[in-house]
A protein has these predicted regions:
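Membrane-proximal interfacial segments on either side of biological membranes
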Residues: 1-194
Length: 194
């Protein structure tokens, strides 16, 4: 069997935390395979799109694979927390503006248990403003501003199981002057490497 169709102006609510609005997509359903194409939606007021999301069913698991795109967005701390809460601890963010391209895959059980999450992201960070209350650098940088600004960063993030690798570069404004930085941060379980 095969079923083709589309959804226009769909709405979903997941556990009163994720509100999906203006959902538009084309779907194709076959035996143990589902395809969602030309997906456009708004999740907690943030625009997302995907050219293709493929879902295949094997025994008691669904394997989900796709590309998720975000257009350039100004996000609040609360929006970030709602979208990324299960993956990231959000520091004291004052402002963030970025766009991203994300390849994702994961398994989900019929009881909605997620595992084997893999994310490969390319992020163009236009601006990130953090309140510096998480690390004391005053002894090293006496003129340190309360706010740290990151601008024009190109970032690649790879996440798999308990390992995350972040590589990037861009401008940082710490002491009233801008510097260009390159960085690589790896977190394996609870161990960080810089």
């Amino acid at each position: 069997y095969q079923i083709n169709g589309f959804v226009k102006n769909g709405k979903l609510n997941f556990l009163n935390q994720l509100n999906v609005n203006n959902l538009k997509l084309n779907f194709n359903i076959g035996k143990n395979k589902y395809s969602l194409a030309e997906v456009n939606t708004e999740i907690n007021e943030v625009q997302f799109s995907s050219p293709l999301i493929e879902i295949s069913e094997k025994k008691d698991l669904f394997f989900v694979k796709g590309k998720i795109l975000t257009s350039e967005e100004d996000l609040s701390r609360d929006q970030l927390r709602l979208i990324f809460a299960s993956f990231l601890k959000i520091p004291n963010i004052k402002k963030v503006k970025f766009k991203s391209e994300n390849d994702i895959s994961f398994n989900v059980s019929k009881k909605l248990k997620f595992k084997d999450l893999n994310i490969n992201s390319k992020i163009s960070l236009d601006q990130l403003v953090l309140k510096n209350n998480f690390i004391n650098l005053k002894s090293y940088l006496p003129n340190l501003d309360e706010l740290i600004n990151f601008e024009k960063h190109q970032i690649i993030i790879n996440y798999a199981k308990d390992k995350i690798n972040i590589e990037g570069n861009g401008e940082i404004l710490i002491e009233k002057k801008s510097d260009f930085i390159n960085y690589q941060i790896t977190k394996n379980n609870d161990k960080f490497t810089f």
